[in-house]
Each structure stands twice: as C-alpha cells, then as structure tokens.
C-alpha cells in the first residue's frame, strides 16, 4: 500500500556503518511512496571515533541509489528524530520521503568553497526559487553546513518573503538532484510547491526570571543599560537571586510574548557595565532574562501544537520535519524521545528530523536563527 509520505528510522541494530544504517532508513521511507519527489535524510555519527567524516554525503549516495528520481537533502547532526523516537549519541539515521503528487521541489546546493560574502545573495536567490511550472510555493527547507553558519547566510534567509522557511544548522550537508551525483555542500535549500499547507510551530525551552525590561542604551552587540540600569548589574543580581547553575539567557520580546527569541550572553564589558549578545537590538527593544527549563519546554511545545491542531480542524497532517536544539533532548529532559513524542501526540504522521546547532523559523514575520527551540514543520492536506 502506497502513501503520500513515508518515514524511516534505523540504528546500530540495522547495521554497523552509516552507509548501512542510512540505507535501511531510506528503504523504509521510499517503500511507502509510489513516486518519490523529495527525500530528507538525517544521520548521527555518535562516537567521533566510529563516525564517518562524510556521513551526509554517504547518506545522500545511498538515498540516490534507492530513489534516483528524487531530490535528496542529507545532513549529519548530533542526533536524529522520527515519529515518536529520538536517537542521540549513537550511529543512527532517519528519513522522510514525499510523493510527487503532493510536493515538487527546486533544489539548490551551495558550493563548499563559496566565499562568505556570497552566502547572502546565494541563499536569498535559492529560497526565492519555485519548481518549474509552479506559481506559488508551499515552503522552503534550508539546511546549513558548518561553513555556512555565518551572519551573511542568516541575513540572506532573513529577507525571504512568501512561503514559510524552516531549517537548521548541521555539521555536514549533502544534496543531489535527479541524474546528478550527490555532492557535499555548504548549504542545501529545497523550495517546495504542491497541494499542501506548511504550518510552523517554534517552541523555546525557556522560563523567564524577570519582567520585560527596555533596552535603554545599546552599542552594536552590547546592551549597555536595561531600564536605565547597567545591564551587567541586572544580570548579576538576577543570577544571584536565581542561584542556578544554568547560564542566564536573554529573551527578546516579539509579537507573541510567550515565544521570545533566545540569545546567549556572549561576553561582558565591566568598565561600561555592558553585556554582549549574538544579535543587535535597537534601543527600545524589550528583553527579559531566563533559563532553560524542561517543564516549560515540554508544556509550551504541547500547548502550541494543540493550538495548531484546533486551528486546522478537518485538515489531515501528511508529514512533518522536526528540528530540535542539541541543548534539548536527554541533556535537558533527563529522558529521550520527549520532543518527538510530544509532536506525535498531535501530529500522527510520518516524521523525520535532527538535533541542530540552531533552528530556522519565522519570528515576527522574519526568518531568524533560534536557540534551545523545537521547530515543527507540519505539512497538512486541505480538508
């Protein structure tokens, strides 16, 4: 029996090499689909001594051998996800295959040697593409390898307009178009079109410790004062009161108060009482201080997925991609499969994904890099 989407998950029980494990995951995913159009493959190398340095490329080759007519995007990461399951710190692979009847793809692979100054324009153009003959996109999936973890790359994607853009930062990325041999690449961008709707849920794993405060003075990446107090004093006082080992995080307020953009504190200037974050905020921005929190993470993801499910009553989830921060998983929850099971409870559809260095999702109508966030990209069939 064929479907419009298929998934696969494999680990050391299916083989002792990335090639064998990826092959097993892809075979499961492809078997469910009559006419594969796009195939996402995610690998995890586990112990670096056992891992494969070109794991994404190996996976892409295995995928093309089994689905030669599909566009293939492969990425290597600390862990992989499938429906209700996660695999961390071990050799594993997951795969998601979608049928040509529901999704068509325009795939762009950025060369590994592309200079940083070329990342912005190349990614902006890749995200704006449409499959041949299509006038409207469903969404864009962008996976960035380590060499494309650059401000220029993020700026190129931030300016994307139109269909939702999701994705993540991986260690290795590879891609292949039908009839073209797979290549390792700096980034792979799959622009999708078809009779599906893509809905995105981004859920940060944080709990706020302070009220919202105004950035009353800033200098580039440095926040100098918060509500006219030296920012370093505010952070020091909050850290003492919280008495937690977890580092404080800066939460940037958006349109949705309960979905802040999370940033780490990157440094301090004691002379000015300023702190630096990996972002530039205009004066007047509202921020709070917070920490990672497993209960808040679990509850927020479940709540947001429930809201989406109610809003899409009558529409059927067809498939999902999930990108979760590598700072979540067992390290945060003390147990495996938490994010994947939470998604499955509200979206019982073929799923694949990975743990990531950062996540890409819309925030205040702009694509931004997220931290400590679970991003669920759910493809719905119209009611």
Which sequence ranges carry the predicted segments?
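Small-residue-enriched flexible segments
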Residues: 1-64, 70-71, 75-349, 354-383
């Amino acid at each position: 029996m064929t479907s419009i989407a298929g998934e696969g998950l494999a680990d050391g029980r299916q083989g002792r090499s990335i090639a064998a494990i990826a092959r097993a995951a892809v075979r499961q995913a492809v078997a469910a689909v009559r006419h594969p159009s796009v195939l996402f493959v995610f690998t995890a190398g586990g112990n670096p001594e056992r891992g494969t340095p070109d794991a994404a490329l190996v996976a892409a080759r295995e995928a093309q051998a089994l689905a030669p007519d599909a566009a293939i995007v492969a990425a290597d990461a600390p862990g992989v996800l499938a429906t209700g399951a996660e695999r961390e710190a071990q050799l594993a692979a997951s795969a998601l295959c979608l049928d040509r009847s529901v999704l068509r793809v325009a795939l762009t692979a950025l060369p590994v040697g592309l200079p940083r100054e070329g990342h912005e324009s190349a990614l902006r153009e890749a995200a704006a593409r449409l499959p041949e003959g299509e006038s409207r996109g469903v969404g864009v999936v962008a996976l960035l390898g380590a060499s494309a973890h650059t401000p220029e790359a993020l700026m190129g994607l931030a300016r994307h307009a139109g269909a939702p853009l999701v994705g993540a930062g991986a260690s290795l990325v590879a891609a292949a178009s039908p009839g073209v041999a797979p290549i390792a690449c700096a980034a792979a961008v799959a622009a999708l079109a078809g009779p599906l709707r893509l809905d995105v849920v981004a859920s940060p794993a944080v709990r706020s410790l302070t009220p919202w405060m105004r950035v009353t003075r800033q200098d580039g990446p440095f926040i100098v004062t918060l509500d006219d107090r030296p920012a370093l004093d505010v952070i020091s006082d909050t850290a003492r009161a919280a008495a937690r080992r977890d580092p404080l995080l800066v939460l940037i307020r958006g349109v949705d108060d309960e979905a802040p953009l999370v940033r780490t504190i990157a440094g301090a200037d004691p002379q000015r009482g300023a702190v630096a974050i990996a972002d530039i905020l205009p004066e007047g921005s509202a921020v709070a201080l917070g920490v990672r929190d497993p209960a808040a993470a679990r509850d927020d993801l479940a709540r947001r997925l429930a809201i989406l499910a109610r809003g899409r009553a009558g529409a059927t989830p067809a498939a999902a991609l999930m990108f979760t921060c590598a700072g979540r998983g067992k390290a945060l929850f003390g147990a495996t499969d938490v994010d994947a099971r939470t998604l499955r409870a509200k979206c019982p559809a073929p799923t694949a994904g990975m743990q990531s260095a950062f996540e890409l999702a819309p925030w205040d109508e702009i694509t931004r890099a997220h931290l400590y966030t679970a991003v669920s990209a759910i493809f719905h069939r119209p009611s």
